[in-house]
A protein has these predicted regions:
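A detector for small-residue-rich transmembrane helices and their helix-helix packing motifs
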Residues: 1-162
Length: 162
């Protein structure tokens, strides 16, 4: 909220992620929202996925997976225009969630996959030329893969202990 409030009075575009970025911008851009709706929808996504991710993975995996997926996707797919907002964090959480659904083989898998596709289609319609698609999709994919690796290594280490 602080960064959103500041963006109402000061130009924070230098803090967004763009080509020629400084290292600290790989994290900072996630905390700057330029509109209330942007902040609102990211907050809703966070509130929806955080308890589910914590239940599925505990506290350690998200602390590892989310920063890695956010930093990797932003370093690889930054663009000429500055990128802002926590959507990359939300898409990382969605990737972790989809990984767990995939692993468990839920019958809900199709339902949630369709919901995710609707979100992506809505973004492409309403956010065309504004939203950095590549960062979102890569954060989702990277967090999905890292989550699968975390659960695989956790299962391997548990089987060796017992």
């Amino acid at each position: 909220i602080l960064f959103y409030s500041l963006s109402r009075y000061y130009d924070l575009s230098d803090y967004g992620l763009s080509s020629g970025f400084r290292d600290w911008q790989l994290i900072a851009y996630n905390f700057i929202h330029l509109t209330f709706m942007h902040m609102f929808f990211n907050s809703i996504g966070y509130l929806i996925y955080k308890p589910v991710i914590a239940e599925y993975y505990g506290r350690k995996a998200p602390i590892i997976v989310i920063p890695i997926s956010v930093i990797l996707s932003s370093a690889i797919f930054c663009s000429e225009k500055p990128t802002f907002g926590a959507s990359t964090i939300i898409f990382s959480m969605i990737g972790m969630y989809l990984s767990k659904i995939w692993q468990d083989g839920h019958s809900k898998r199709q339902k949630y996959t369709i919901m995710l596709l609707i979100i992506l289609i809505m973004q492409s319609i309403f956010g065309y030329n504004v939203i950095n698609w590549k960062i979102h999709i890569s954060a989702l994919a990277i967090s999905f893969i890292l989550s699968r690796l975390c659960t695989t290594f956790t299962m391997i280490s548990r089987s060796k202990i017992s």
